[in-house]
Amino acid sequence: MAVFTTVSQDEIARWLLDFDLGEVRELRGIASGIENSNFFLTMEHEGQTRQYVLTIFERLSFTQLPYYLHLMAHLAERGIRVPAPIPARDGEILRPLKGKPATIVTRLPGASQLAPDAQHCAEVGDMLARMHLAGADYPRRQPNLRSLPWWQQTEREILPFLDAGQRALLQREIAHQAAFFASAAYASLGEGPCHCDLFRDNALFEEDASGRHRLGGFFDFYFAGNDKWLFDVAVTVNDWCIDLATGELDAERAQALLRAYHAVRPLTETEAAHWQDMLRAGALRFWVSRLWDFYLPREADMLQPHDPTHFERILRRRLDAQPANPESAPLPWI
């Protein structure tokens, strides 16, 4: 999240006249993230104060956005803890604001857990599997817009900024993934709507009366798309279950997340055989996007681009850990 488009409280108050949400009490920009303009919104209605998140979309279009917003509504209706879009009086959940698409969603309770333990990871794995199953009958379809075709397109733009070793790594890995994506094994993998960006800062935990952290929900679905479920798991493991300094997988956390996921949606032998390929794909996707954001940034208030070397390091670690015969490697959580 970030703020590319600034708005005043008065502007928001006028825009909100089309909603039954009451009066604006506070509007506060959210600094984290790099894609859209986001604000915490406090409203007072009939003596009650409620919290929302306002998002102004900087890249996604009115045509693309219904996929994401209706997916969130679909999941929320099925008991998955995600932000629910708030409709205006006319029933629409997407409206123009300062010439760009904008929406309001409920604000989930809790705070991000940036130093997760095995229990946090288990809760994430359980809910991720339930989310995949709940989304299986979602009727809209849109591919993951940051998948292989985008990596190949973006490669040409970022190569001039890389040294020889980085260029060789990027080109080799994109070629490897292109071959994997073209394989019969890849085509056979289970798929459906995926979050595709489920990092530590895109989930919230609440502390209960006993002091235990409970998962409050997932948010920021604006990179979601139809993809292989295993890719979504790999992206999640590559963030939640690593040593941030080295990129190494933490076995205890990884096993906790994967066992919890596997208990809800058992993974297949084909998924086991290509787990390493997907870990590499997940690392590559974010190395490419962070290189692009770092070297070809957009102007924005509060923009904080991420260090691309983090995912370069993770990709190299996954390559170093590649078993001699990946197809015979057992599932890492069994």
UniProtKB/Swiss-Prot annotation:
Coiled-coil positions: none
Keyword Calcium: no
Entry EC no(s): 2.7.1.39
GO process terms (BP): threonine biosynthetic process
Entry's Gene Ontology molecular function annotations: ATP binding; homoserine kinase activity
Domain of life from the UniProt record: Bacteria
Catalytic function, reaction form: L-homoserine + ATP = O-phospho-L-homoserine + ADP + H(+)
Keyword Phosphoprotein: no
UniProt similarity note: Belongs to the pseudomonas-type ThrB family.
Name recorded for this polypeptide: Homoserine kinase
Organism field: Cupriavidus taiwanensis (strain DSM 17343 / BCRC 17206 / CCUG 44338 / CIP 107171 / LMG 19424 / R1) (Ralstonia taiwanensis (strain LMG 19424))
